[in-house]
Amino acid sequence: MPPPASSVDFSNLLNPQNNSTDSTPSTPVDSSKTPSTPSSTQSNSNMASSVSLLPPLMKGARPATEEVRQDLPRPYKCPLCDRAFHRLEHQTRHIRTHTGEKPHACQFPGCTKRFSRSDELTRHSRIHNNPNSRRRNKAQHLAAAAAAAAGQDNAMANTASAMMPPPSKPMTRSAPVSQVGSPDISPPHSFSNYASHMRSNLGPYARKGDEASSGMELYLLATAASQVERDEHFDFHAGPRNHHLFSSRHHGSGRLPLLAAYAITHNMSRSHSPEDDDGYSHRVKRSRPNSPNSTAPSSPTFSHDSLSPTPDHTPLATPAHSPRLRPLGSSDLHLPSIRHLSLHHTPALAPMEPQPEGPNYYSPSQGHHGPSISDIMSKPDGTQRKLPVPQVPKVAVQDMLNPGSGFSSVHSSTANSVAGGDLAERF
């Protein structure tokens, strides 16, 4: 009698050797071949059924649920391809693969990455939140390096702006006067003193950055005003030697740019040595270092943006012409040659006598003769309300050939224009 199917199945699975030993002695019996064939066929079919039942027992019956899920309806179909999905969010996520849309952006400061799926964004955010991440450490190092470089650039820009001299006040020095033209000889130690001041204070890049502020400019103006008053008072009592310095500075002391230039000049050449008590010694220090035997600074010593012809400082040996330095013609100015100059002290007031203001010394004053526009318009007679002809073409050929009578010809032409005459009558 054959055993039950369940016992045969488990016995064959657990003890395959016993099954083979049981089947071997039945082979030599010839009479049992015919009945053993159906029994062996039945046992093989039972083994196949038991093997097919083993995966559901071992894997928790997962293939059965997958088969059930495959049978569920897929209502959400992709309009761009043939795929269909059970849930709407799966369809939406799939459509983004076609369109390239990435709505999930990283919220970390400095990160510009975007993702089409929220789980990818979550996985990416762990990079920023993980303190041991190499990428995060590298990003922090790059940010710190960029901040340090920006701070260094700002510091260099501030330093450069503080060291740059003000472009509106270029400090130019003219050529030094030779020893023959200077009547005063410097003491032996003035060159070394000036050289030390030149290295320490006179360089345009050696100024401090706070001198460019408005408060320091006001302080410079106030200091310059007090220094001008004190020096003028000192020069007034100093005697004939410095009298021309006072008179030349008296014309330019009321201009604010010159006050600032005067303050900068005095601040750069000021020291607390006994030599500065004299109004002459601090001007000696402004001589150029490559001419130690000459102490007379040329005229003008410092040129700042002042449009006035009067310089800040005049030379110690004043030329024999007007101290106002009006524009003179080349034929009117006759200076003595270098060979005729002496090394002795010049007379006190001899070169300072002002020359009479002739018509040829200052040409712009000639253009203001004649009535003004208000005088012409206020005349009761209508025939006299005529503007004068411009004075440039009024000079006749005879007046140009005879420059001595040019001034009278201008007056006569002006009178004719006021009277109403035209150009043809004058010729």
Curated annotation (Swiss-Prot):
Q: Which Pfam families match?
A: zf-C2H2
Q: Which UniProt keywords apply?
A: DNA-binding, Metal-binding, Nucleus, Repeat, Repressor, Transcription, Transcription regulation, Ubl conjugation, Zinc, Zinc-finger
SMART domains from the entry? Answer: ZnF_C2H2 (SM00355)
Which biological process terms from the Gene Ontology are attached to this UniProt entry? Answer: carbon catabolite repression of transcription from RNA polymerase II promoter by glucose
| Superkingdom field | Eukaryota
Annotated segments matching region Disordered? 1-49, 117-136, 159-185, 269-333, 348-427
- List localization entries: Nucleus
Q: Name one GO cellular component term.
A: cytoplasm
GO molecular function of the protein, one example?
A: RNA polymerase II cis-regulatory region sequence-specific DNA binding
Purpose = Transcription regulator component of the regulatory network controlling carbon source utilization through ubiquitination and deubiquitination involving creA, creB, creC, creD and acrB. Represses the transcription of the alcR, alcA and aldA genes by binding to a GC-rich region in their promoter. Also plays a role in response to carbon starvation and the control of extracellular proteases activity.
UniProt feature, compositional bias: Polar residues:
405-417
Q: Where is the composition biased (Low complexity)?
A: 15-49, 289-303
> What assembly does the database describe for this protein?
Interacts with creB.
**Protein name (record):** DNA-binding protein creA
The protein's matches in PANTHER family, at most eight in alphabetical order, are given as: REGULATORY PROTEIN MIG1-RELATED (PTHR47428:SF1)
Residues in C2H2-type zinc fingers: 76-98, 104-128
Q: SUPFAM superfamilies from the xrefs? A: beta-beta-alpha zinc fingers (SSF57667)
Q: What post-translational events are described?
A: Ubiquitinated. Deubiquitinated by creB, probably to control its activity or amount.
Similarity-based family: Belongs to the creA/MIG C2H2-type zinc-finger protein family.
